[in-house]
């Protein structure tokens, strides 16, 4: 089983690479941008892991991967990468260029990579797509996250279209909606971490390994599980 994970060198991406690499029958291909040392470490640590350079800010880099995908025979695609920062500023202070940049550096790569993988999946009449979203799209998102949540909401809706259009090809498209995780991507001050932990129902923050466990289970489920969303947020927001 060939699995492509975008953004796999750190945080949740790395946790998913390590979790899935423990299954010998899986061949993991993950993309990385700047973290070459981490990418090489993962390649050297697991015989069934392959790193591939990818920069969401570079269309040529995206196209190189897209052109390579037909030769990779991807059975499972995990869309995890996000270019940019989650936290921005209030909507009325947000420059329009922030929205267009987020679209060009996240939605366009998502579309191109997913379309390329769908081509092989349709031919073999099997495939699984897992899209990492955020629990912030449930109910009302926190202030200052308009660009990030709008981008993730776009992918969330595309996932619904994909599952509807390609279910007849035995292809599933599901979403995982994790809460905040203390990773480099979502780095905040120590006092903010303490506040979030104190306010959390379990008094502890979600860890990447916990989300990786859910993803590992999700890709084993029946093709009947299609168009489903899996919030991982200790019921802080309920769908």
List PLM regions with ranges.
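Conserved mid-core segment of classical short-chain dehydrogenase/reductases
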Residues: 63, 67, 82-100, 123, ...
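Catalytic loop of short-chain dehydrogenase/reductase
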Residues: 83-84, 128-154, 159-168, 180
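Catalytic Tyr-X3-Lys loop
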Residues: 92-112, 126, 130, 155, ...
